[in-house]
Amino acid sequence: MLHCQGCHLPEAAGFEGRVPPIKDFAGYFLHSQAGRDFLIRVPGVSRSALSDSEIAELMNWLLQTYSESQLPDRFEPFTEAEVASLRVDPEPDPAAARELILNNLADELPLLAAELTNNN
């Protein structure tokens, strides 16, 4: 968590309007392949000094610790190989990609749609 809390804070809450939360939110991204890829491609993850294995382990821990209720029923943990293949192509515009992914997911996930409405 040391590598994430500088922006997302120790309790994974983020900064409203500036840094998105991990807590009770990040698990939604795993409901689509684009969202899953995004979590590894964001610059803070893809450009981290952590190894591929460490990133996979950290992401799996973060998701299961801070956003378990939002994970898909058939959650598949990140693997070292998956992280290695995704982090070579960092997301150039994380804010735009995040908005697009969440808007697409909101059509399928009523709970996410309600959260997005309440937070906008």
Question: What is each model feature region?
Answer:
Residues H31-F38, E54-I55, T79-E82:
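Stable alpha-helical elements in mature extracytoplasmic
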Residues A49-M59:
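Mature extracytoplasmic domains of secretory-pathway proteins
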Residues S53, Q64-N120:
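Flexible coil segments in periplasmic/lumen-exposed cytochrome c-class electron-transfer proteins
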Residues M1-P10, L58, L62:
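The canonical Cys-X-X-Cys-His
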Residues P10, F25, F38-V45, W61-T65, ...:
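Structured segments of extracytoplasmic/periplasmic soluble domains
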Residues A13-S48:
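Gly/Gly-Pro-rich "capping" loops immediately C-terminal to redox-active cysteine motifs
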Residues C7-L9, Y28, Q70-P72:
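A short, ordered amphipathic alpha-helix with a cationic face
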